[in-house]
A protein has these predicted regions:
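Extracellular/periplasmic catalytic domains that process cell-envelope and extracellular macromolecules
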Residues: 36-37, 69-72, 105-109
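A short beta-strand-turn-helix
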Residues: 24-41, 71
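Short active-site neighborhood of thiol/selenol oxidoreductases, capturing the structured segment around
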Residues: 38-52, 77
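Non-catalytic, surface beta->alpha helical segment in thiol-disulfide oxidoreductase systems
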Residues: 60-62, 96, 100-148
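Sec-dependent N-terminal signal peptides
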Residues: 4-13
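Thiol-based oxidoreductase modules, predominantly thioredoxin-like and allied folds used
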Residues: 22-25, 64-96
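Solvent-exposed loop/turn segments at secondary-structure junctions
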Residues: 48-53, 61, 82-86, 108, ...
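Sec/Tat signal peptide C-region and signal peptidase I cleavage site
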Residues: 15-20
């Protein structure tokens, strides 16, 4: 009985620890406020509800421990639905919906990852599905090319 309890506690602790390891997604305006207080780049995951490759990124790439750690350390992560016209926020004195902001960022395919520097200027886009290793390589090149906060 004691062993069973120990095994159950171990499994519960492992599941709890695993559940805590996830990307800290923010709303766009939250990420902007955060980078003003503590400068880091933003990574904006622009997706749609119908996008199968977006769901594959969520399921496979964004659950990879190395991807989670790297994004949480180097970026403020944002999820943005390119077809959401309801939720509005202010940015640089203008009102935007998520759809309007995605269009302003010139996103034309999904998934698409817009990288924004700490001064809130778009740097580049990483379009399309990427496996964890490939995704980390792309992000690493951006950070190591001097765009990241030091």
């Amino acid at each position: 009985m004691k062993r069973l309890l120990i095994v159950a506690l171990f499994l519960a602790a492992a599941n709890f620890a695993q559940a805590q390891e996830k990307i800290e997604w923010l709303k766009f305006e939250e990420a902007v406020a955060a980078t003003e207080a503590n400068p880091k780049m933003l990574i904006v995951d622009v997706y749609t509800d119908w996008c199968g490759w977006c769901k594959k990124m969520d399921k496979e790439t964004f659950t990879d421990p190395a991807v989670i750690k790297y994004i949480n350390e180097k970026f403020y992560a944002v999820k943005m639905n390119a077809e959401d016209n309801k939720r509005e926020f202010d940015f640089k004195g203008k009102k935007y919906s998520e759809a309007k902001m995605a269009a302003t960022m010139r996103v034309q395919s999904y998934p698409n990852f817009v990288i924004i520097d700490p001064t809130l200027q778009n740097i580049t886009q990483l379009p399309g599905y990427r496996q964890p290793t490939e995704f980390l390589e792309g992000l690493g090149q951006i950070v190591h090319n001097g765009f990241g906060s030091k």
